[in-house]
Amino acid sequence: MDENLLLSLIENNAKMEVVDLAAALNETEENVDKTIKDLEKNKTIYGYHTLINWDKTNHDVCTAVIQVNAKPERDYGYDRIAKKIYNFPEVDTMYLLAGNYEFLLIVKGKTMVEVAKFVNSRLAVIEGIERTATMYVLKQYKNTGKLVEDDNKDAAERLLV
């Protein structure tokens, strides 16, 4: 079975039924189901995610992208400081980077003030963190390969001259 194709299909549509996956892969349902279970067990598939346009709800969400400069620790590199950061519930996503900053965080809170308090009182005070740069998301156009639909798209296009 082409596991990469299976993973691509699931990544694109996690709700795709096993019968449809089997047909797309020209495999039996049993084989596809077993392969998915194996991929979940070995953590190749480590979760399923629903994309939500929070702007269409009455739930307040403020998303920030935070770049972090940190000093590596002897014998541990960045792993121990990363663990201190990623265990905060506000941290949605975290990457180790090559470039001007060591970490890139996606942080969520109810308001800009809540995110700022998190950065000021919990993140920036961690030993080894040298500097942070916080940017607030104003609008989301695309998330995980999917376009975020905008009801005002036509009106915005008409305004362009």
What are these regions (language model features)?
Residues 1-161:
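A compositional/biophysical signature of low hydrophobicity enriched in polar/charged and small residues
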